[in-house]
């Protein structure tokens, strides 16, 4: 048995994004004992994609196509494969109902290209998309088996874990149940985490360990197999415990579809507390991230965006002379912003951000210098200084995530 992975997307071919999906899929194939000697990357071009499929067929009996299932004109994967196999595309009623509900919620018309997301090659088995809208597929055609998977990692990984791996286990004769646990870390780089886990990774057999980095955080996926799910879970526990013993201080939560914002809101709910924020260089990004979490309105009533010294003084009632004396980029300003915002919003906890996003310096402070304030009811406010690398957007994003981690740890203390 041999498998071949074809990643579809011009942005991958041009180096605009990294093909992390291919690496993840390859590791899963290895864990199942399925040989994979070739990978291809093809742009969004039907004829060239069909050439890649034919080449894969000549040397592999499992062809896994990743990407190109979306609604845009350059998403051609399922159409190309269906035409190659001389099959028509048919509609999955459940996927269409989900799509219609989403379109109705967004109050926009249903378009033919959108409908394509709910379609699959006739005769295929559906691979359910738990996160997005584009269905995947498992297609047996003669001596070959084909798999269609979505490109966005947040859709791809859950589909692989929950829909594809059980099928691959049976297809390969690997009868055991596979269970994965996803650990999420922030505040540590992938290289440092891998160094910390070096011996665990070097000696891994079952469970296996895979690390990934995205948006300044690191994800560790631990996968084990067993005769039953309970047996596989029992194998996971010692490995997860060993990882937590080494880098638990950077851990914030479990799950593929998780985030610092979601964990923060969940912890606010568990403590029945309210949060607010006062933002300067992040310009509301912290509050926007909170606002993306369903149900947050119970725990976040509002906050402040105070970009200039004048608005800090006016909106937060901080003495302008004190601000001018200490400077905008200072511990004083971070503490004052956090505490005054907390009082004005009558919140239990408050986070503030002030600093230099770049590229220019400010008050003699280099780009990347960020003060984050933290104020809690009944406690003195505190301030922490950071020197974040990267461009303007990187600095702002790192600041937001660091502020969330600070608030999360304060609530968990």
From Swiss-Prot:
Segment forming the signal sequence: none
Highest taxon in the source lineage: Bacteria
Gene3D superfamilies reported in the protein's UniProt record: 3.30.70.2860, CinA-like, MoaB/Mog-like domain
UniProt record similarity statement: Belongs to the CinA family.
Protein name, as recorded: Putative competence-damage inducible protein
Organism: Lacticaseibacillus paracasei (strain ATCC 334 / BCRC 17002 / CCUG 31169 / CIP 107868 / KCTC 3260 / NRRL B-441) (Lactobacillus paracasei)
């Amino acid at each position: 048995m041999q498998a071949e992975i074809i990643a579809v997307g011009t942005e991958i071919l041009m180096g605009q994004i990294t093909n992390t999906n291919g690496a993840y899929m390859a590791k899963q194939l290895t864990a199942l004992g399925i040989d994979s000697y070739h990978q291809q990357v093809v742009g969004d071009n039907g004829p060239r994609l069909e050439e890649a499929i034919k080449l894969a067929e000549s040397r592999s009996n499992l062809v896994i196509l990743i990407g190109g299932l979306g609604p845009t004109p350059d998403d051609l994967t399922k159409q190309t494969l269906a035409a190659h196999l001389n099959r028509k595309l048919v509609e999955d009623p459940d996927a269409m109902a989900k799509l219609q509900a989403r379109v109705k919620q967004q109050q926009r018309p249903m378009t033919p290209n959108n409908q394509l997301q709910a379609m699959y090659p006739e005769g295929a088995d559906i691979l359910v998309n738990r996160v997005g809208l584009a269905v995947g597929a498992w297609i047996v055609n003669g001596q070959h088996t084909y798999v269609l998977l979505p490109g966005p990692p947040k859709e791809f990984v859950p589909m692989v874990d929950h829909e594809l791996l059980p099928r691959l286990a049976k297809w390969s004769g690997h009868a055991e149940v596979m269970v994965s646990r996803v650990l999420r870390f922030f505040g540590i780089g992938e290289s440092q985490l891998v160094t910390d886990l070096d011996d665990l990774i070097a000696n891994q057999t079952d469970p296996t360990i895979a690390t990934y980095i995205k948006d300044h955080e690191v994800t560790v996926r631990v996968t084990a197999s067993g005769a039953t799910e309970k047996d596989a879970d029992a194998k996971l526990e010692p490995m997860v415990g060993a990882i937590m013993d080494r880098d638990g201080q950077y851990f914030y939560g479990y799950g593929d579809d998780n985030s610092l914002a979601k964990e923060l809101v969940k912890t606010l709910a568990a403590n029945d507390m309210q949060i607010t924020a006062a933002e300067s260089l992040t310009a509301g990004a912290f509050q926007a991230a909170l606002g993306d979490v369903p149900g947050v309105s119970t725990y976040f009533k509002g906050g402040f965006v105070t970009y200039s010294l004048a608005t800090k003084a006016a909106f937060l009632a901080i003495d302008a002379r004190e601000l001018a004396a200490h400077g905008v980029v200072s511990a004083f300003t971070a503490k004052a912003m956090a505490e005054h915002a907390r009082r004005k919003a009558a919140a239990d906890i408050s986070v503030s951000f002030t600093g230099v996003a770049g590229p220019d310096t400010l008050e003699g402070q280099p780009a990347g210098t960020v003060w984050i304030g933290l104020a809690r009811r009944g406690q003195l406010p505190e301030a922490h200084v950071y020197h974040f690398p990267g461009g303007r957007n990187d600095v702002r994003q790192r600041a937001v995530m660091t502020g969330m981690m600070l608030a999360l740890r304060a609530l968990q203390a």
